[in-house]
């Protein structure tokens, strides 16, 4: 990231005098807290929660909340740093931030996830607000989890404000929010190819993952005339030389909606496709690779 701004930085000695880089690489503040919740067996569980408010030079802190066993402060600091630049590139008045917990929603009931989200928000709510810090979803946090957190935020603040993005439509969310990131990624890829005089039609695309981003990317890639040949999950990846589109995408959405985030059943459902266990799809030859 820093290499990408090196030339501009060196053209402005006033940046060095003001120690802009030194100020950019450390967050404004970090909140670390214990999240105590009760599982379905009535046993008390404890996780760590974080919110990194990285930089608000051009607007309120903005960045997702991630629930995954791998979450730690180091990862969130880097993601918050990166988010600051990503948000600045939109030209919208948004700063950068990131948050999350080492809680994993996998294998948890809806009631357990709801109780955790409410306990998480019980610790974080006072540091959020439409003009202060506006979280969103990320890995392990979709519309359901955002809804649980926003519901608790409303209860605690007694206000209905634009403090979360990624909400469901019933909470004032955007109509195409689930697809938006994947769609945007493909528009960007298509624009890059066009600057080189390359047509995306007929190109093969390898995609990792099959969450909201990968779903949107696969859908838009197909609409633009490309052929998506891989998707992946925690169990491995699917290679489908015939292309992953239409009813195949619908099938994966139904599989995921059932709470099953593995991709192996795809190979049983659609002859001609191959499931490769325990690997990521980058060994597959393709014109475009999209880590989603």
Description of each model-found segment:
Residues 1-32:
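Short, Gly/Pro- and small/polar-rich lid/capping loops
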Residues 165-168, 173-282:
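Glycine-rich phosphate/diphosphate-binding loop of Rossmann-like nucleotide-binding domains
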Residues 5-13, 80-88, 117-132, 150-161, ...:
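Structural signal for hydrophobic packing residues in well-ordered secondary-structure cores
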Residues 68, 87-201:
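Glycine/serine-rich phosphate-binding loop and adjoining beta1-alpha1 elements at the start
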Residues 31-105:
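Glycine-rich, N-terminal phosphate-binding loop and its surrounding beta-alpha-beta segment
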Residues 282-292:
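Ligand/cofactor pocket segment of small-molecule handling proteins
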Residues 50, 93, 100, 131-133, ...:
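Structural motif
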């Amino acid at each position: 990231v820093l290499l990408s701004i090196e030339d501009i930085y060196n053209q402005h000695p006033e940046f060095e005098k003001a120690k802009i880089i030194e100020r950019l690489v450390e967050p404004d503040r970090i909140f670390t807290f214990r999240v105590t919740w009760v599982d379905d067996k009535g046993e008390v569980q404890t996780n760590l929660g974080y919110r990194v408010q990285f930089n608000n030079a051009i607007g309120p802190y903005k960045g997702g909340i991630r629930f995954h066993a791998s979450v730690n402060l180091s990862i969130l600091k880097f993601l918050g740093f990166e988010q600051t630049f990503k948000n600045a590139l939109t030209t919208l008045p948004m700063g950068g931030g990131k948050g999350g917990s080492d809680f994993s929603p996998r294998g948890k009931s809806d009631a357990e996830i709801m109780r955790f989200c409410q306990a998480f928000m019980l610790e974080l709510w006072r540091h959020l607000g439409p003009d202060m810090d506006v979280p969103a979803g990320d890995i392990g946090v979709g519309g359901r989890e955002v809804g649980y957190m926003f519901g608790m935020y409303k209860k605690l603040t007694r206000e209905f404000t634009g403090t979360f993005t990624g909400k469901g439509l019933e909470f004032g969310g955007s109509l195409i929010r689930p697809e938006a990131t994947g769609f945007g990624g493909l528009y960007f890829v298509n624009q890059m190819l066009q600057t080189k005089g390359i047509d995306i039609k007929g190109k093969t695309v390898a995609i990792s993952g099959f969450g909201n981003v990968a779903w949107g990317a696969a859908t838009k890639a197909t609409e633009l005339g490309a052929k998506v040949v891989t998707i992946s999950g925690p169990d491995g990846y699917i290679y489908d030389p015939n292309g992953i589109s239409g009813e195949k995408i619908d099938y994966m959405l139904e599989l995921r909606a059932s709470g099953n985030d593995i991709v192996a059943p795809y190979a049983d459902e659609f002859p001609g496709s191959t499931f490769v266990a325990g690997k990521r799809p980058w060994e597959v030859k393709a014109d475009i690779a999209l880590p989603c």
